[in-house]
Amino acid sequence: LSQAQDQAIRDVVVRQESHGYPVVTDGEFRRHSFQESFSECVAGFDVPKNINLYYEKRNLNETPLERAEQNFEEAGPAIITRRGAAQRLKVVRNLPLEEYRYAESVANVPAKVTILGPDRIAQRFKWESSLNVYKGLDDFVEHIVAIERQMIADLVKAGCKYIQIDAPGYTAYVDKVSLERMRSRGEDPERNLQRSIDADNALIEGFP
């Protein structure tokens, strides 16, 4: 699989360069999901032992031009589904750094990487079942920022000049269904939004 991923990355880098892109990406070929830029880097989430079973049975009942709803409460990978923490999260690898090093090695122009922003991570964290590990969302997000700042620092040290903070979750704050989900969990959407903005600012503070 890693050899196939390597070849796919080389191919997509060449294609981007052939179109004159001044900065290229690796196409995220080493991820099941873009959200793995964080979940694959840490240990401590309460997840099933065999996550592959989730992907094998996953069915979103997708219909063209219609909203596909997902059951975020089912047992599955962290962040793709809402999972709690069995222990405080700890870094076990830096996937974006691994991606950057390979992309940079096969590219003739600078490579960029993406890191999932704190907002999506917080939205998919089952804080209510993790109060024996984290005091609440504020405590959890503060820890996420600390972890991701170290990941970014490692990327900067390796020479990466282009780091995208991926923040798709901000659309939730104008989406009725998502807002209702937050309120049903006892959360204040406006407080969540401000926390996420503050977290993003803290994440990039001091970096060039």
Placement of each model-derived feature along the sequence:
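Domain-level signal for soluble alpha/beta catalytic cores
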Residues: 1-208
